[in-house]
Amino acid sequence: MGSKSPEDHRQGPDGGSADTAIAIVNPPKSAAASGLLQGMLEGQDEDGDDDDDEKTGIDLKTNDGAKKKRKRNKKKSKKLSVVQQTSPPRVPLATLFDNQPYPEGQIVDYNVKDDNLQRTTAEELRHLAAVRDMDDDFLKDYRKAAEVHRQVRRYAQAIAKPGVSMTRLAEEIDDGVRALTGHEGLETGDALKAGLAFPTGLCLNHVGAHWTPNAGAKDVILKHDDVLKVDFGVHVNGRIVDSAFTVAANPVYDNLLAAVKAATNTGLEEAGIDARIDHISEAIQEVMESYEVELNGKTIPIKAVRNITGHNILRYRIHGDKQVPFVKTKTDQRMEEGDIFAIETFGSTGKAYLQDDVGVYGYGRNENMNPAVLHQSSAKSLLKTIDANFGTLVFARRQLERLPGVEKYHLGMRTLVNSGLVESYAPLVDIPGSYIAQFEHTVLLRPNCKEIISRGEDY
C-alpha cells in the first residue's frame, strides 16, 4: 500500500469469467516434507509393508500329502484424508499446517560494506524499541500472514481475467484472508487478532493506488486492455504483510510490468541494515527508467512515480515514519536492524505524478486527536465501534458495514472526518489515458539476514 510523499501526504493512522475452473492448490512442498500431509499409502498396513507379501506359518495337508499355506486375509488399510487447500481458498492455515512451521520467505545474506557507520543516540533508541518488538511469536506471525497472502493471491491471479468484476475479485480476496487466518471479524475485536491489514486495492490503468469497490457504486468489469494493480495486506496480531502485483491480459504492456518488477527487485536487493535510502531510491529510478513501452505506435518512456513511496511498517500501522521514494532524493535516513519495509515501486506512462480523485478508498483513525471534542451521540458510538474493531488499521466501507449493528453511519462518519478523529483516503490518479503498474514485497531486516517474507514463486 503506497505512502504519499510529504508535500501531499495525508498519512494514515500512523499510519476468464466467473465460472472459470481452477485446479485445487496443493499445500507447499515444505509443509508436506515436514509431515503436514500424514496418511498411509493404500495397500499398506501400520508397519508400512505390503500385506500381499505376508504369509502365515499355518501348514495344511492336501489329500496327496502335499503341504500348502493358507493366506491370511489382508488387513483393510486405513485411509487418512489428506488436507488440501480448496479453490477458492477457505481452509484455515492452522488446519492446513497442523502445528507445523509456516514457510520462510526468501532469506538473503547482507552485503557487508565498510562504511564506518555511526548511529546517533536517537537512532539507537529507535533500534532497541524495534528489536524489543520482535518477540517469540514475531516470525511465526509474519510467516503465517505471508503464507495467507501467497495462497489468496494465487487464487486471485487465477480469476483476474477479462470479464471478472472488481466487486467479485475484492470479495474473494477479503473472504479468503478471513478464512485462512481463521478470523471472520464479526465479533468485537476479532479483526484485530488477524485478517485484512487495509482495504483491498484494485486499481485500473491511470488509477495508481487507493481504489476499492464500494456498495452502491456501479460495478467495474476487467477488460482485455486494462492494467490491473492488486494490492492487499494480511496481518496476524498486528504483524502486517503488504504485497502487490500487476496483471495485464494484453502483452503490449509486458515491458511496463517488467520495468516495475525489476525496479522493485532492485530495491529489495539494495535494502539492508545501514543501507542509505537515497542510494536505494536512485538505484530504483535508474532501473525503472531504462525501460520503454510501445503503445499505439508510439515509444513511451516509463517513468518512476514521483509523489508516492515505499514505507516502513509498524505494528498495526501500515505507514511508519520512513519513506523509500522511487526517484533520486536527498535524505540522511538509513535502514536499521529490526525495520520492516514495504518495498514497492510504481511506473507510469503518464506524468508520473498522482493526485486525489473523487470517492473514498477507506478510513483510518487519527490517534493524535482527542475524542472529547465529540458531542454527537451517533459519532461517539461509531468511534467506539471503529476503535474496538479496527484500532489503527485502515478499513473500507464494506468492512464496516458487515459488522453487526452498524447502520446509517454516514452522518456520524462525516462528523468524525470533519473533526479530524478519522481520516478519509481518496483514490490517487495520473492523467487519463496513462497506465501504471505496481509490484511490492515486505522485507524484514533481521540481525543476520533480510527475509523477503512475502516472496513467492509468482513474483
From Swiss-Prot:
Q: How the cofactor binds, per note?
A: Binds 2 divalent metal cations per subunit. Has a high-affinity and a low affinity metal-binding site. The true nature of the physiological cofactor is under debate. The enzyme is active with cobalt, zinc, manganese or divalent iron ions. Most likely, methionine aminopeptidases function as mononuclear Fe(2+)-metalloproteases under physiological conditions, and the catalytically relevant metal-binding site has been assigned to the histidine-containing high-affinity site.
Q: What does this protein do?
A: Cotranslationally removes the N-terminal methionine from nascent proteins. The N-terminal methionine is often cleaved when the second residue in the primary sequence is small and uncharged (Met-Ala-, Cys, Gly, Pro, Ser, Thr, or Val).
Q: Which residues does the annotation say bind a divalent metal cation 1?
A: 231, 242, 440
> Which PANTHER family does the entry mention?
METHIONINE AMINOPEPTIDASE 2, METHIONINE AMINOPEPTIDASE 2-2
Q: Where is the composition biased (Basic residues)?
A: 67-79
Q: Enumerate the catalysed reactions.
A: Release of N-terminal amino acids, preferentially methionine, from peptides and arylamides
Q: Where does substrate bind?
A: 210, 319
According to the UniProt record, where is the region Disordered?
1-87
Q: Where in the cell is it found?
A: Cytoplasm
EC number annotated for this UniProt entry: 3.4.11.18
- Offer one example of a GO biological process linked to this entry: proteolysis
Sequence ranges of Basic and acidic residues compositional bias: 1-12, 55-66
Task: Name the residues that bind a divalent metal cation 2.
Answer: 242, 311, 344, 440
- Cross-referenced InterPro entries, in alphabetical order? Creatinase/aminopeptidase-like, Met_Aminopeptidase_Type2, Pept_M24, Pept_M24_MAP, Pept_M24A_MAP2, Pept_M24A_MAP2_BS, WH-like_DNA-bd_sf, WH_DNA-bd_sf
Per the record, a Pfam family? Peptidase_M24
Q: What cofactors does this protein use?
A: Co(2+); Zn(2+); Mn(2+); Fe(2+)
Q: What is this protein called?
A: Methionine aminopeptidase 2-2
